[in-house]
Amino acid sequence: MENEFKLKVEDVQDKITKNTKAIILNSPSNPTGAVMEKEDIKAIADLSMDHNFLIISDEIYEKIIYDKKHYSPAKYSDNVITINGFSKTYAMTGLRIGYLTANEEHTEELFKIHQNSIACANSTAQKGAYEALTGPQDEVHKMVSEFKKRRDLIVSRLNGMGYETVNAEGAFYVFPKIEDENFVKKAADAGVVTVSGAAFGSNGKGHVRMSYANSYENIEKAMDILEERVVNG
């Protein structure tokens, strides 16, 4: 839970070698909900120029941020491939439509792979994505406001149970510190689905990912179940 799960420029700088070709950034983060600070984004972007490596920036949750602002490394470096889509911001997961942006050199190389892999997203999905992107954004703001309420609820309840939980700044996940290796199974047996932090790599051990992409009422119910049947059961 160091730095509230936020990647710092020092973490990257220490790992760069002459063999470094690319790094992946994910902010806001799945599974932690962390949002990187502007100064770290900019500093890592500067490193990509100094050491000539690519940043692959996964920004699928860029609009789901609470009380902060999203910063893309593409604003500060030309060595960036930005990945984004419509699944999260516009709740269009079933339509499977996304996009990337990059400089012309990288786009030409990416197109060679793309044109021999798939043709294009279906026209219905493309039209839906266009309307979502160009239309009123009121519903997006409402959804983010509702996610914030759900976040406040789940963070408060988990901390109240004794599970140290960082206040997520984006996306719709929390990553509480839970050492019990059997917690995920106990929770599932009680009817609450969670994901072991180890599923996201060795650094995730000792944590559990929980999503609050559900109704406020269902989250309350889930927290009651965990408290009664897993924590105190």
Task: Please report, for each region that a protein language model flagged, where it lies by residue.
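PLP-dependent class I/II
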Residues: 1-233
